[in-house]
Each structure stands twice: as C-alpha cells, then as structure tokens.
C-alpha cells in the first residue's frame, strides 16, 4: 500500500507496521469510493495484509473484497526481502507456503527474479525451476493459486516450466538490463495457458497510456 504522498515504497518501509495498516485502510476506503469491489494485496510485510483482510471480515473497516497473498516468498537478499518471508531450497519453499496458507493467504506470491529492491538484479532469476515447482505443488495441494514476479527472461521460462498460474510483469529482461523479446518464450506462455499481468501502469504514467 502506497501512502500517496510522494514517497517511494523503500521510504515507506521505514514506517511501522501499524502505520502501514492505517495506510492500507485509507487505500481500501479510496478504492471503495471509486467503485472498485475486489482488489489484490500482492505482497505485504509481516502480517499487514492479513490484518487488513481480518478487519474487513469482522466489519471493523469498510472496503472492497480483498484477496491477500501476504508476505511474498523471496530468496536470501531477494526482491522484497524486507517483507520477511525468506526461502532457499525446495523444502523451505514448501514450508513458507504452508505457513502463509495457515495465516490466511488466498494465493501465494513468489519473487522469481530480482526487482526494484536495492541489491537485487532484475534480469537475474532468483529461483530454480525445482524450487518454484515445490512452491507451486504445495500451493495447489492447499487449493491456492500462485503468482510469480518475473522481470528476468530466465525467470519467465522457469515459472512456466514450474506450472505457475499467473506471471507478473513478463519483461523479457536480460542480465545486461536490456529487453529482448523472445518469440519462443511467448509461444511457451501461450501453450502453457499461464495468465499474464503486464502491469503497464507500474512503468508508464496513466495519462501516458490514455494518450
């Protein structure tokens, strides 16, 4: 949840969990006022997302229906590691999924590549196909879908091979930080039936999209 006051998400992470919950409440109310009835919480620190979900369920706050992933699963030093769900290796991936399901996750978010977090490389895959498959298999066992943050081209291939349900960004980014569209990967995406969320608004101002 962004505060809407011009700060970046890195600056916002300096806030306490309590302040971030209050920011989330404000955002829920704004979405509802705009007529939005369902939104995703797509990776929140600690139990912030689950707290908002419980607040809505108990009628403490008003807002849209909230589908919460909770903490995104990431590798040591990986994108959004500050959310505090670190998993390295197949067994830790399974354990993280079980923990998140127990806490109330509606689906599982996995950081399959680096991103905007300082120290990570967006064009580098964060997990092996086997690690991703372990998380996907465990999530499906508990009737949960999976979403993977994939900026790196290699992370896209691995997510498809692992059976991930939804791919975020799908940037075809190389380790040299250059975009190189690969038709063979696009064909894999089509044949697998994986859902794609290109998140265009993350990189382009909304007015620019309209124009």
Regions found by a protein language model. Name each.
Residues 1-58, 130, 151-162:
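Metal-associated gating/positioning segment near the N- to mid-region
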Residues 56-64, 141-143:
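Short helix-capping segments at alpha-helix termini
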């Amino acid at each position: 949840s962004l505060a809407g006051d011009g700060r970046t998400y890195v600056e916002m992470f300096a806030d306490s969990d309590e302040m971030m919950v209050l920011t989330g409440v404000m955002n829920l109310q704004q979405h509802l006022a705009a007529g939005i009835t369902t939104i995703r919480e797509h990776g929140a620190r600690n139990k912030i997302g689950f707290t908002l979900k419980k607040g809505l369920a108990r009628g403490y706050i008003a807002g849209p229906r909230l589908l919460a992933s909770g903490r995104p699963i990431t590798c040591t030093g990986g994108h959004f590691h500050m959310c505090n769900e670190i998993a390295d290796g197949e067994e830790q991936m399974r354990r993280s999924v079980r923990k998140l399901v127990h806490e109330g996750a509606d689906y599982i978010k996995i950081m399959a590549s680096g991103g905007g977090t300082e120290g990570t490389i967006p064009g580098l895959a964060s997990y092996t196909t086997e690690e991703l498959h372990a998380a996907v298999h465990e999530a499906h066992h508990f009737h949960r879908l999976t979403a993977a943050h994939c900026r790196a081209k290699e992370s896209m291939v691995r997510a498809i091979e692992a059976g991930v349900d939804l791919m975020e960004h799908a940037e075809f980014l190389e380790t040299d930080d250059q975009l190189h569209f690969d038709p063979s990967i696009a064909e894999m995406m089509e044949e697998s039936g994986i859902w794609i969320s290109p998140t265009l608004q993350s990189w382009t101002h909304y007015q620019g999209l309209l124009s």
